[in-house]
Amino acid sequence: MEGESVKLSSQTLIQAGDDEKNQRTITVNPAHMGKAFKVMNELRSKQLLCDVMIVAEDVEIEAHRVVLAACSPYFCAMFTGDMSESKAKKIEIKDVDGQTLSKLIDYIYTAEIEVTEENVQVLLPAASLLQLMDVRQNCCDFLQSQLHPTNCLGIRAFADVHTCTDLLQQANAYAEQHFPEVMLGEEFLSLSLDQVCSLISSDKLTVSSEEKVFEAVISWINYEKETRLEHMAKLMEHVRLPLLPRDYLVQTVEEEALIKNNNTCKDFLIEAMKYHLLPLDQRLLIKNPRTKPRTPVSLPKVMIVVGGQAPKAIRSVECYDFEEDRWDQIAELPSRRCRAGVVFMAGHVYAVGGFNGSLRVRTVDVYDGVKDQWTSIASMQERRSTLGAAVLNDLLYAVGGFDGSTGLASVEAYSYKTNEWFFVAPMNTRRSSVGVGVVEGKLYAVGGYDGASRQCLSTVEQYNPATNEWIYVADMSTRRSGAGVGVLSGQLYATGGHDGPLVRKSVEVYDPGTNTWKQVADMNMCRRNAGVCAVNGLLYVVGGDDGSCNLASVEYYNPVTDKWTLLPTNMSTGRSYAGVAVIHKSL
């Protein structure tokens, strides 16, 4: 207001006007309330001026009615109404354990409470009973922050029971967005039929392929096969079989015993087969729930850059937020690691093998982005550095590399379902510093260094998991060891690398349909031993070295414009031989 000075403080303030006689002093002391409650709590601890005892189980708590009534509508109604408790000196609270009630009454006096994994499930309903809505909301916020593929369905059920509407929606959205990881957990396998149907029928389900939904149904049925077998048809009604590749329908769905033994399921399969026989324009005319593509909510992504040389092996891990154009440090590796294979699989980032500064290793560390934590899993059969790593059909492949004495042609695969490594067919050529990528169900090993001939390689091999065989495909136009290899729009990119002392900035692209390579625009900088990933239709090349120094810069390729652009912000550390993966941003 004009002519008035307003400031929230414990100072004396003056309202000035035309008439000096209208002066007045307003004192606002924000610490007053806190001091008053502190004194009241001290009185309570000494059992002074207390006029009520609150009892739960065998815990007795002395308190002041006016304080409880001022902070809790539950107590206010109790003490001001016509109930017998309004005058009782001792009041028993049922459905709340003594320790929890004590914490909540402490909160009433102090405005402080600690919410933990251990107490949140008893604290929230107790806070709801006492109508301490701030505590209830804090519990909901805590549970939301703890959402993880292994617990989101349990949190969803808890939120439903206690009518926590926002938390229920958040947990349900999380389950939909992380379905490939959620379906692997005990919580999913323990869902009721209606709960499974509700989840897999959602248009918002985030799956790279409808294969995941089919696998989830089979897993759920087999978990308690005798009692669940009768539900097979009802579940398959929600699997969008027409959207599956024809090869998968023939080789996997048709061969599944649970499908063969159910006539309704066979009808769904026939429907899908007929759909594939139709021309594309006629397919678009078919409108039913099983031919409708899912429309998941797009989750923001971040890029994880793991370890590397700077100039020695490091533990540092950096995270790039694409939306905010910002780099952050996240949890370090348990030990130094460079020249490792790094992939994203089943909701986690895997760092496979590599070099720790003194030894080539066969160890594997796994990063959980929700917990910001690394853990160790089963080690590979062989030590490998400068290997290639890729994911195909839910298996992590470790390809070639160097064991400290020789280049490797061997290849091994890891199943996260069994936590075991096993060998598959070896390549035809030993390859260290090899780049790998997966296109249309085939694994490609690109270039590298052949220790036997002591030459960098231009040859490329393709692995077919169905036949467990490697064959040569078209050579690149030039020899490349330490090339950054990535996949974009069904094509395989080989970026940079080196041939002896010559470090390249050229890039070429392989089309599996024509078995040919073609040149595209050069990068802005010569790079070898860089990390590569694809995000939102762009190919990112991260760090590496130019033959004389490690690079902190990142550039990306747009295939529409055939141009490379440098990111405006660099990593905090120049690093080569780092691994790169893309994960969903933890919200």
Curated annotation (Swiss-Prot):
Known outcome of mutating residue 78 to V: In PHA2D; impaired interaction with CUL3
Gene Ontology terms: cellular component: Cul3-RING ubiquitin ligase complex; cytoplasm; cytoskeleton; cytosol
Assembly and binders: Homodimer. Component of the BCR(KLHL3) E3 ubiquitin ligase complex, at least composed of CUL3 and KLHL3 and RBX1. Interacts with CLDN8.
Resulting phenotype, residue 438 to I: Found in a patient with hypertension; uncertain significance
Post-translational modification: Phosphorylation at Ser-433 by PKA or PKC decreases the interaction with WNK1 and WNK4, leading to inhibit their degradation by the BCR(KLHL3) complex. Phosphorylated at Ser-433 by PKC in response to angiotensin II signaling, decreasing ability to promote degradation of WNK1 and WNK4, leading to activation of Na-Cl cotransporter SLC12A3/NCC. Phosphorylation at Ser-433 is increased by insulin. Dephosphorylated at Ser-433 by calcineurin PPP3CA, promoting degradation of WNK1 and WNK4.
Keyword field: Actin-binding, Cytoplasm, Cytoskeleton, Disease variant, Kelch repeat, Phosphoprotein, Repeat, Ubl conjugation pathway
The protein, known as: Kelch-like protein 3
Stated consequence of mutating residue 432 to N: In PHA2D; impaired interaction with WNK1
Compartmental location: Cytoplasm, Cytosol; Cytoplasm, Cytoskeleton
UniProt Kelch repeat ranges: 302-347, 348-394, 396-441, 442-490, 491-537, 539-585
Tissues expressed in: Widely expressed.
Record domain BTB: where: 50-117
Implicated disorder: Pseudohypoaldosteronism 2D: A disorder characterized by severe hypertension, hyperkalemia, hyperchloremia, hyperchloremic metabolic acidosis, and correction of physiologic abnormalities by thiazide diuretics. PHA2D inheritance is autosomal dominant or recessive.
Pathways per UniProt: Protein modification; protein ubiquitination
Family annotation (Pfam families): BACK (PF07707), BTB (PF00651), Kelch_1 (PF01344)
Family, per entry: Belongs to the KLHL3 family.
Residues found modified as Phosphothreonine: 295, 375
Biological process according to GO: distal tubule morphogenesis; gene expression; macroautophagy; monoatomic ion homeostasis; potassium ion homeostasis; proteasome-mediated ubiquitin-dependent protein catabolic process; protein K48-linked ubiquitination; protein ubiquitination
Modified residues (Phosphoserine): 10, 376, 433
Main location (coarse class): cytoplasm
Gene3D superfamilies: 1.25.40.420, Kelch-type beta propeller, Potassium Channel Kv1.1, Chain A
Segments forming domain BACK: 152-254
Function: Substrate-specific adapter of a BCR (BTB-CUL3-RBX1) E3 ubiquitin ligase complex that acts as a regulator of ion transport in the distal nephron. The BCR(KLHL3) complex acts by mediating ubiquitination and degradation of WNK1 and WNK4, two activators of Na-Cl cotransporter SLC12A3/NCC in distal convoluted tubule cells of kidney, thereby regulating NaCl reabsorption. The BCR(KLHL3) complex also mediates ubiquitination and degradation of WNK3.
Organism expressing this protein natively: Homo sapiens (Human)
Signal peptide: none
Chain's gene name: KLHL3
Any one GO molecular-function label of the UniProt entry: structural molecule activity
